[in-house]
UniProtKB/Swiss-Prot annotation:
Similarity remark: Belongs to the UPF0677 family.
NCBIfam families: mthyl_TIGR00027
Positions contributing to S-adenosyl-L-methionine binding: 128, 157-158
Alphabetized GO MF terms: methyltransferase activity
Keyword Methyltransferase found: yes
PANTHER family given in the database record: S-ADENOSYL-L-METHIONINE-DEPENDENT METHYLTRANSFERASE YKTD-RELATED, S-ADENOSYL-L-METHIONINE-DEPENDENT METHYLTRANSFERASES SUPERFAMILY PROTEIN
Record's keyword annotation contains Cytoplasm: no
Taxonomic classification: Bacteria, Bacillati, Actinomycetota, Actinomycetes, Mycobacteriales
Summary of the function given for this chain in its UniProt record: Exhibits S-adenosyl-L-methionine-dependent methyltransferase activity.
SUPFAM superfamilies: S-adenosyl-L-methionine-dependent methyltransferases (SSF53335)
Annotated protein name in UniProt: Putative S-adenosyl-L-methionine-dependent methyltransferase MAV_1058
UniProt record, GO biological process: methylation
């Protein structure tokens, strides 16, 4: 189903299913002999969602290589593991720099407030759809998980007035903040909503604040991109999942996040997926393994 203004979803459908896919990949990565990252909460969260293909991937019943070949997403598990590690390292560096206020927008099924070692005095704000926040909180509570920082959750759509909700939850704009928008600015918001998101973050960011995100579009409407999306959609359907990446992304020219932040006084550094693989100690992507994710950019920024 094509995206529309004000549409809704859950973790088993539409764009929400991609959050479950990423969590399943983190669970699979955690099972490896020398894991790039460790997320012990990913598997129980994926099981609770109940999508069969992702439950099997998370639990080890499904060979990741077989799935990646079938859906046409080479090195999928490595890709999401490297991305997760990139942002985990970003938060570690922010903590060492003295930042004690964190905002994760569209947090999905990642349990960073539970699985990372935060410095004493850190407050983490998580923003996502109300149903996603409620589901994750309830599931983690059932398995006895406890946050490793002060956690404040805000259930709201990013297309609504989330800055007001964030401040109502106690966010202090006078304190430097470490922001994260993982897997958000890659076509899952309308282009104008991407700009609003960035333009809302900057005035809430004191000097020394940091920002990290991936950006671009998983479907640029080119013939090659459209054909790749078709093959991937057919692969997921063979696995019993109706997930059409092309239909999940909004059309239009998406935002060059690094350039936009740079114009607003942020010092930015950009990376490619190959940089993330190298930093994680993973074998580099071959030419045959280059897919839509390899076209995305990654940015870290500091507010001056």
């Amino acid at each position: 189903m094509t995206r529309s203004e004000g549409d809704t979803w859950n973790l088993a459908s539409s764009v929400g299913a991609t959050a479950t896919m990423v969590a399943a990949a983190r669970a699979a990565a955690t099972r490896r002999p020398r894991p790039v990252l460790t997320d012990e909460y990913a598997e129980p969260l994926v099981r609770a969602v109940g999508l069969d293909v992702f439950t099997k991937l998370a639990s080890g019943e499904l060979d990741p290589d077989d799935l990646e070949r079938d859906v046409g997403f080479a090195r999928m598990v490595d890709t999401f593991a490297a991305r997760g590690r990139f942002y985990d390292d970003y938060f570690a560096a922010a903590g060492k720099a003295g930042l004690r206020q964190v905002v994760i927008v569209a947090s999905g099924l990642d349990a960073r407030p539970y699985r990372l070692s935060w410095p004493a005095g850190t407050t983490v704000y998580e923003i996502d759809q109300p149903e996603v926040i409620a589901f994750k909180t309830a599931t983690l509570s059932r398995i006895g998980a406890a946050p490793t920082a002060e956690l404040r959750t805000i259930g709201i759509d990013l297309r609504q007035d989330w800055p007001a909700a964030l401040q109502d939850a106690g966010f202090d704009a006078a304190q430097p903040t470490a922001w994260l928008a993982e897997g958000v600015l890659i076509g899952f918001l309308p282009p104008e909503a991407e700009v609003r998101l960035l333009d809302s973050i900057t005035p809430l960011s004191a000097e020394g604040s940091r920002f990290a995100a991936d950006y671009g579009s998983l479907n640029d409407a080119s013939q090659a991109s459209t054909e790749q999306a078709r093959r991937t959609t057919e692969g997921w359907r063979r696995r019993g999942l109706d997930m059409d990446i092309a239909a999940l992304t909004y059309p239009g020219k998406h935002t060059d996040v690094a350039a936009h932040l740079g114009a607003d006084g942020w010092a930015t550094t950009t990376f490619g997926l190959a940089d993330l693989f190298a930093a994680a100690g993973l074998p580099e992507l071959t030419e045959a393994e280059q897919g839509p994710a390899a076209t995305l950019s990654f940015v870290r920024a500091i507010k001056s």
